[in-house]
């Protein structure tokens, strides 16, 4: 649900003319009513993809508090355009837990068939700070989102924690990355140069009890949210975008 633009101060610290529309509850993307965590979300960037056997929409949203990014969502929603439906490639990271994965919940991983999994890891935002540098190989959607945040005067932490939820069948795909800032729980990270050096890496995190507890908290959130996400995917089968 989108709310009308507001020209007064809000929790995000942005004037409505700068923020644009604020979205809460859920958002229709390519016929799927994508569920959103609580709060007001701002659209940052959007796009489309088209492949020989599939097409769909891409979207990013941000949740801002006092001009600081505290939540981020990246949505990929697509449908098979082949007859018969050709399905979607296997989701990276869902087949096994690797050295970067904090949590893996895999209920099915059949490339080009039934896929149902979610993965938790950390999301390193430092490359976004160089969004204007074309030698920095950012995906176009992330580059546009970072540029929008810069235009709004919004800063963001070095890293956040990501839960990437995926459902796919031969007819469609819904993959959403829900990203949370530990700063909202007053948890900070040591400054590091690379993703692999992060405090949040599975090989490092046991040194930080507060970070272990935060991962456990988000695991509970993921377990609770997962059925809602799966229902949204199933409900979208008969409701393609117009």
Describe the residue ranges of each PLM region.
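Mature extracytoplasmic/lumenal regions of exported proteins
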Residues: 68-242
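N-terminal Sec/ER secretory leader and immediately downstream segment
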Residues: 2-109
């Amino acid at each position: 649900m989108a709310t009308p633009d507001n020209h007064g101060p809000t929790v995000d610290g942005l004037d409505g003319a700068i923020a644009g529309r604020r979205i809460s509850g859920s958002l229709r993307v390519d016929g799927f009513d994508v569920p959103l965590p609580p709060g007001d979300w701002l659209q940052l960037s959007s796009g489309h993809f088209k492949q020989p056997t599939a097409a769909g929409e891409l979207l990013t949203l941000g949740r801002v508090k006092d001009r600081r990014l505290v939540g981020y969502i990246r949505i990929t929603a697509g449908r098979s355009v082949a007859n018969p439906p050709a399905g979607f490639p296997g989701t990276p990271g869902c087949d096994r837990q690797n050295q970067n994965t904090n949590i893996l919940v895999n209920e099915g991983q059949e490339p080009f068939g039934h896929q149902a999994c979610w993965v938790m890891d950390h999301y390193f935002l430092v490359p976004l700070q160089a969004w204007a540098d074309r030698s920095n190989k950012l995906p176009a959607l992330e580059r546009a989102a970072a540029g929008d945040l810069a235009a709004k005067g919004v800063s963001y932490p070095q890293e956040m924690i990501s839960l990437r939820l995926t459902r796919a069948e031969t007819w469609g795909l819904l993959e959403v990355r829900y990203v949370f800032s530990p700063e909202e729980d007053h948890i900070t990270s040591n400054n590091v140069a690379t993703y692999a050096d992060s405090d949040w890496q599975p090989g490092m995190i046991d040194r930080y009890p507060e970070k272990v507890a935060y991962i456990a908290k988000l695991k509970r959130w993921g377990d609770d949210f997962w059925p809602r996400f799966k229902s949204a995917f199933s409900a979208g089968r008969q409701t393609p975008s117009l």
